[in-house]
Design a protein with these regions (language model features):
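Short, membrane-interfacial amphipathic segments enriched in basic
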Residues: 1-17, 204-211, 309
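Aromatic- and glycine-rich beta-strand/loop motifs that create alpha-glucan
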Residues: 4-38
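Membrane-spanning alpha-helical segments of multipass transporters and channels
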Residues: 24-309
Length: 309
């Protein structure tokens, strides 16, 4: 008997069934999604309470503000990475069975797992941003939207990275260990501690390829490096003139003597390397990492098989 097609169903039919299956699975797994929403709620209230009424115009206040974004970025990213590993690993068994019977193409599994994450990531990040953003004193509707979108892209990037490890490695435990080790290296080279300017030249290449540092740079530059026109320094009076209302335009108070006079924007860009002009290039790089992780996830689904014979 000869068959003209490898699979009985068309690609359109496969797509409909697999995408619906993933959407139903996510909807019927409240422990996964409610955990993300609960952590987003707790983190936003925690940071909002601690930094309520904070003054970011001082040297100590600005460093604390960047540290707040660093910790918030890290916690949101780690939540996305860790929580997706069990659900991705458990579904792999069904995928192996159905691939053996040629029920569905691996591409539609990849497509379904990609689509199912998007609404939940954007919704949980919106909850976080809606509470956190005004409570810590950040302003601006456009800045709010960009902050939410880029935080969501960070969540997608780490979620897809987790799926990639779950598909590529033999077990959930191995994926978790390897992922934590790699993310630990990323944390060191995100540009906050140590700051970008203090990273030794021999390790600059690690800083330049760390995915998390692009997201942190975007979020920090949005709120601390936004200044359309820097104020001018009056050398005679030793004061800044023509100071605009944006946070990035404000003079940095109580800065160390070796730093001298500077603004919030200049300090953020010079010390932490988080430049406002790089927001859009960095966003493209984050999207590039998302695509890269999805490609590796697809290749893992297609060519790797960790079943025990």
């Amino acid at each position: 008997m000869l068959f003209s097609k490898k699979r009985a169903a068309t690609n359109t039919t496969q797509m409909k069934f697999v995408v619906k299956r993933f959407l139903d699975m996510y909807w019927r797994t409240p422990t996964y999604n409610l955990t993300r929403f609960f952590i987003s709620l707790v983190l936003s209230l925690l940071f909002g309470t601690v930094f309520f009424g904070a003054d970011y115009n001082s040297y100590q206040g600005l460093n604390s503000g960047v540290g707040m974004l660093f910790i918030g970025t890290l916690f949101n990213g780690m939540t996305s990475f860790s929580s997706v590993l069990p659900i991705a690993s458990n579904d792999r068994a069904a995928f192996y069975r159905e691939r053996a019977s040629q029920t569905y193409n691996a591409f539609w599994y990849f497509f379904g797992s990609t689509i199912a994450e998007i609404p939940y990531i954007f919704a949980s990040c919106f909850l976080y941003t809606a509470i956190f953003f005004p409570m810590v004193g950040f302003t601006g509707f456009t800045t709010f939207i960009l902050f939410w979108v880029n935080l969501s892209l960070l969540g997608l990037m780490l979620t897809y990275m987790g799926q990639m490890f779950a598909y590529a490695l033999p077990s959930e435990e191995v994926a978790h260990i390897i992922g934590i080790l790699i993310i630990s290296v990323f944390i060191t080279f995100m540009g906050f501690s140590p700051p970008a300017e203090a990273i030794p030249s021999a390790y600059k290449w690690l800083y330049k390829i760390t995915p998390l540092r692009f997201s942190l740079s975007i979020l920090t530059a949005l709120v601390f490096a936004d200044c359309p026109e820097l104020p001018t320094w009056n050398t005679t009076l030793k004061v800044y003139e023509n100071i605009q209302s944006e946070l990035g335009c404000q003079p940095l108070a109580n800065s160390p003597v070796e730093i001298g006079h500077t603004t919030v924007k200049q300090f953020t860009e010079d010390v932490f390397g988080m430049v406002h002009a790089d927001i859009w290039p960095n966003t493209i790089i984050v999207l590039g990492y998302i695509v890269l992780f999805r490609i590796f996830a697809l290749l893992s689904l297609r060519f790797l098989n960790h079943q025990k014979k």
